[in-house]
A protein has these predicted regions:
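Surface-exposed assembly/interface segments
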Residues: 1-375
């Protein structure tokens, strides 16, 4: 199934970037006044997305227990983001609703790869549905104090916390340490370097363990709710995130790679179109579009976001043929990691270059099992 390059409603100043210059940082939607610096306060109060450097963010991280729950939670989330890798962060103040603030953030500056809100909210389903409708653009990281979530939303990471129902101060902020750690991990992934693609699984991000026993682990694993688990392995005791999945079961690292690849192709297209007199609606034009798609795919192979020689099931092979209508595409995916093509279509009065990119996503080995044969 061909996926058309999305229509750009508006081009932000930082959207036209050099090749490899795509940035995906984290966004926190806050219901409280957490930005107080003179250079940003007016924009923040006006509902604009504010980008804070690491130093600017750290300067705002004083959150005494006398602060409201929302302030403490939002600041602690930002604090953890910087502590675990994010070199800058984005924040936007909640307007009438969290959903409205998220929609406004998307319209203003969509260069955030992952985002969270500063509290548990009955709007989470609405936000997840809207985010899913946007395609591979953002990862929604959400706190969950129970394992009852039955939704299978795409691009949503549910994170378990066990801090109860505290109502103010640093106790509530503790609930959001894990969200901040996940946002920091997502914002710090190296999407350009060799083998930079990452997985949330097995990462010790410095947060407290919330799951200690097998029965609880199995409950949360079945619900695709992530947690920091305490594991004892024949002596050493370790804690790390498990299982690193989105609500629909996809690896969260794979989702972030997909978001980056989509953004890279979109930005490369804008740069191509702006740098030419025109891109012709013929085979020459489709070849130019295909060329930028192939370049992104090749970079993803180097990065580990696309895997060469990954075993494919019969069902996956049938799916490739169904999508591409080309049996040779299976061999291409197995030997090079991907298959791509592009074609010109007339949609209404506009010619659209629709591309198809099928690739072996960068899954990781989740466990090791073996047989010992003594002879």
């Amino acid at each position: 199934m061909a996926i058309p390059i999305k229509e750009y409603i508006g081009i932000q100043e930082n959207a036209v970037v050099a090749e490899g210059g795509v940035e995906l940082v984290g966004l926190v939607i806050s219901s409280a006044d957490i930005v107080t610096g003179d250079s940003h306060k007016a924009d923040y109060d006006a509902g604009k997305v504010v980008t804070l450097s690491k130093d600017e963010a750290v300067a705002a991280f004083t959150h005494p227990s006398t602060e409201t729950a929302a302030v403490a939670a939002a600041k602690h989330t930002l604090d953890m983001m910087v502590a675990y890798g994010a070199y800058k962060v984005k924040v936007i103040k909640k307007s009438t609703t969290y959903l409205a603030a998220f929609q406004s953030a998307c319209a203003q500056d969509g260069s955030f790869g992952a985002f969270a809100i500063d509290a548990a909210s009955d709007e989470e389903d609405d936000i997840a549905v809207y985010n899913q409708s946007l395609g591979a653009q953002h990862l929604f990281v959400s706190a969950d104090s129970t394992a009852t979530l039955a939704n299978k939303y795409l691009l949503k990471v549910n994170v378990y916390n066990d801090q109860g129902t505290e109502s103010s101060g640093d106790d509530v902020a503790d609930d959001f340490k894990q969200i901040g750690a996940v946002l920091g991990w997502a914002s710090a992934i190296d999407h350009v370097g060799a083998n930079g693609a990452s997985t949330l699984m097995y990462k010790d991000l410095g947060v407290d363990a919330t799951v200690y026993d097998l029965a609880t682990k199995q409950t949360y694993d079945a619900a695709n709710v992530n947690y920091c688990g305490l594991v004892q392995t024949h002596g050493p005791t370790r804690k790390f995130f498990q299982m690193g999945r989105c609500a629909d079961g996809m690896d969260a690292g794979v989702a972030m790679s997909s978001i980056y690849m989509t953004a890279s192709i979109e930005n490369a297209w804008i740069a191509l179109a702006m740098g030419a007199t025109k891109i012709p609606a013929n085979s020459d034009g489709s070849s130019q579009v295909l060329g930028l798609v192939l370049k992104v795919a090749e970079n993803a192979v180097t990065n580990g976001a696309i895997l060469v020689d990954k075993p494919l099931t019969q069902a996956q092979q049938r799916q490739i043929v169904e999508f591409t209508r080309n049996e040779a595409a299976v061999i291409s995916v197995q030997t090079t990691g991907y298959y791509a093509n592009a074609e010109i279509k007339l949609v209404g009065s506009d010619y659209v270059c629709a591309y198809t990119l099928v690739y072996a996503k960068g899954d990781h080995i989740a466990k090791v099992s073996g047989s010992h044969i003594l002879v």
